[in-house]
Amino acid sequence: AASQSAFSHTRLEVPVVVEGVRASNNVVIGHSCGDGATTIANSTVFPDGVDSTVKVDGVQTTNVVTDFVANWGNLNQKVLDHSVFPFEDEKNDPDGNVVGFWVKGGKMPNHYNAYIPFRAGAAIIEPESCATSVKFNIAVADICKITNIAGFADSKLNLWTPAVGSNYDGPGLYGY
């Protein structure tokens, strides 16, 4: 099974999918930034397989994603939906593979939930690997106020990102 997990309020509606099965899914925004703030945008990023951190049994390894996923590349695609955010697009790598998506222009109140649809492709575990399951951790930012990294605060954005030593998993910003 391929899966994603985050210990937070923003998550995937379907956190676990069966190997070889394509599925419709949603990034679920569980709340806004509080204090009357509205979520105006979201950015979601999938592992790109280029500089992704790969762990085996919780220990970082020099293996690459393709050592464990036979059909890596372009497994996810944004599903067009303007019901909450009127502007959206996919993020692509130089080869045109979808590595994430963004939405903006919304005004999701703190007491609402929002669903951002995408299609999760049918990942296939590399038969030559020892893997019996693969977990993909995604990075999600719910944005309430546009700011630079120095201005990051809970009242401006909510981050649910893997803690990999980047500027986006800093203290108090929910790196997991």
Residue ranges with predicted function:
Residues 14, 103, 138-140:
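Surface-exposed beta-strand edges and flanking loops
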Residues 35-128:
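Structured domain cores in non-transmembrane regions
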Residues 6-7, 98:
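General secondary-structure edge motif
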Residues 26-30, 119-126, 133, 139:
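Extracytosolic low-complexity repeat regions of secreted or lipid-anchored proteins
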